[in-house]
A protein has these predicted regions:
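General alpha-helical segment detector with a strong preference for membrane-spanning helices
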Residues: 99, 179-180
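Amphipathic, interface-forming alpha-helical segments with heptad-repeat character
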Residues: 25, 33-42, 48-167
Length: 181
């Protein structure tokens, strides 16, 4: 009788291990799989079976277009006018392996890269040209970011400059607000 319960418990544990290692990858996602700590495979949408204790899901990556809205960056134009510019980056993961292992914090890396690129582009322009050339700025930033993020498995679809606000205008608005209080 005891043997029966032991066998029943073993069968139950075996079934539990097998069922817990059946993985369904949803549409528009991929899973990066590591076997014994090193990259093994990238699973696409569908049913997969993971080898217990040998394989693990290292990262679940969305293939949908993602939006990263970055805070305003202080930049200086060629004619030494300081302004605040905030950007929105639309990107998509194209290679889950590179995205997982290419850079430690991809969103933070994109933010730093976009801020540096924005400073370089705006630094070559004068204030008037900056205010009227939003499409040119968007195109240049998109091209530079897309090329730089290729090695991370990321495609930058577009970059939008949301606001271009000269700092003198910001100070004027702050003084108006204080005066109204």
């Amino acid at each position: 009788m005891v043997l029966f319960f032991v066998i029943l418990a073993l069968v139950f544990v075996l079934v539990l291990v097998i069922v817990s290692n059946i993985v369904i990858v949803p549409q528009s996602k991929v899973y990066v799989i590591e076997r014994l700590g090193s990259y093994s495979d990238t699973w696409t949408a569908g049913l997969h079976v993971k080898i217990p204790f040998i394989e693990r899901i290292a990262k679940k990556v969305s293939l949908k277009e993602q939006v990263a809205d970055f805070p305003p960056q202080p930049v200086i134009t060629r004619d030494n006018v300081t302004m605040q510019i905030d950007t929105v980056v639309f990107f998509q993961v194209m290679d889950a392996k590179l995205y997982t292992y290419g850079v430690n914090q991809p969103i933070a890396a994109i933010e730093s890269l976009s801020a540096t690129t924005l400073r370089n582009i705006i630094g070559e322009m004068e204030l008037d040209h900056t205010l009227t050339s939003r499409d040119v700025i968007n195109g240049k930033i998109t091209a530079i970011l897309d090329e730089a993020t290729d090695k991370w498995g990321i495609k930058v679809n577009r970059v939008e400059v949301k606001n271009i606000i000269p700092v003198s205008y910001t100070h004027l608005r702050a003084h108006e607000t204080k005066a109204n209080l």
